[in-house]
Structures are given as structure tokens and as C-alpha cells.
């Protein structure tokens, strides 16, 4: 599956990454190779394979929440493109 340069640019914009023209071309090739590999997995016959979440028995170990010191709000919000009333402001995606 070929990834176009415009798709790489769109993904980079979403991730707030900036690439040179050469990096965009390299990323398009690399992402195309990755998607080709993932598509190969669709060829596997998994009809008789029992669905699992983990290949080994595993369970979550929960702990009590503890309030710990963190970064000041102002410092955290310095990297946010949009803020409002001391919070992150994100585009509305649900009507």
C-alpha cells in the first residue's frame, strides 16, 4: 500500500511534526513498507486460533492513587497550541 507525500504531511501536521522534503519522501517509503508488512498478516489463516488478549496469563495489579507533586500548570500549558481558563483547548469532534 503506497502512502503519498500528502498523507505523510497530513499525519505530520496531526502529530505537530515538521519534516524536510527529503524526510517526507523517506517517511512515505518507510510507512508504505510497514503497511505492506501489516497487510501480509491478513493472509494468515487464523480460523482455528482462539482469540486472546495476551499470549501469557497476565492481570493488572492496581495500586491506590497517590497525589504527588507535578509540574506547574503554567509550564505545562506553555506547549499547548490553545488554552482556555487554565486548561487545554481542543477542537470539538463530537456533535
Swiss-Prot record:
Pfam families associated with the record: GatC
InterPro entries found in the cross-reference section: Asp/Glu-ADT_sf_sub_c, GatC
Query: What's one GO BP annotation on this UniProt entry?
Result: regulation of translational fidelity
What reaction does this catalyse?
L-glutamyl-tRNA(Gln) + L-glutamine + ATP + H2O = L-glutaminyl-tRNA(Gln) + L-glutamate + ADP + phosphate + H(+); L-aspartyl-tRNA(Asn) + L-glutamine + ATP + H2O = L-asparaginyl-tRNA(Asn) + L-glutamate + ADP + phosphate + 2 H(+)
Reported EC number(s) for this entry are 6.3.5.-
- Per its UniProt entry, what is the enzyme's top EC class, as one word? ligase
The UniProt keyword set, sorted, is: ATP-binding, Ligase, Nucleotide-binding, Protein biosynthesis
**Which residue windows are transmembrane per the record?**
none
Name the Gene3D superfamilies for this protein: Glu-tRNAGln amidotransferase C subunit, N-terminal domain
One MF term from GO for this chain? Answer: ATP binding
> What highest taxon heads this organism's lineage?
Bacteria
Q: How does it assemble?
A: Heterotrimer of A, B and C subunits.
PANTHER family, from UniProt? GLUTAMYL-TRNA(GLN) AMIDOTRANSFERASE SUBUNIT C, MITOCHONDRIAL (PTHR15004:SF0)
Q: Which family does the entry's similarity section mention?
A: Belongs to the GatC family.
Q: What does this protein do?
A: Allows the formation of correctly charged Asn-tRNA(Asn) or Gln-tRNA(Gln) through the transamidation of misacylated Asp-tRNA(Asn) or Glu-tRNA(Gln) in organisms which lack either or both of asparaginyl-tRNA or glutaminyl-tRNA synthetases. The reaction takes place in the presence of glutamine and ATP through an activated phospho-Asp-tRNA(Asn) or phospho-Glu-tRNA(Gln).
Designated name of the protein: Aspartyl/glutamyl-tRNA(Asn/Gln) amidotransferase subunit C
Q: Which gene encodes it?
A: gatC
Amino acid at each position: 500500500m503506497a502512502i503519498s507525500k500528502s498523507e505523510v504531511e497530513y499525519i505530520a501536521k496531526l502529530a505537530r511534526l515538521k519534516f524536510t522534503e527529503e524526510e517526507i519522501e523517506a517517511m512515505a517509503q518507510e510507512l508504505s513498507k510497514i503497511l505492506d508488512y501489516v497487510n501480509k498478516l491478513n493472509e494468515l489463516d487464523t480460523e482455528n486460533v482462539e482469540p486472546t488478549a495476551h499470549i501469557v496469563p497476565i492481570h493488572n495489579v492496581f495500586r491506590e492513587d497517590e497525589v504527588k507533586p507535578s509540574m506547574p500548570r503554567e509550564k505545562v500549558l506553555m506547549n499547548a497550541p490553545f488554552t482556555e481558563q487554565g486548561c487545554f483547548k481542543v477542537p470539538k469532534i463530537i456533535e
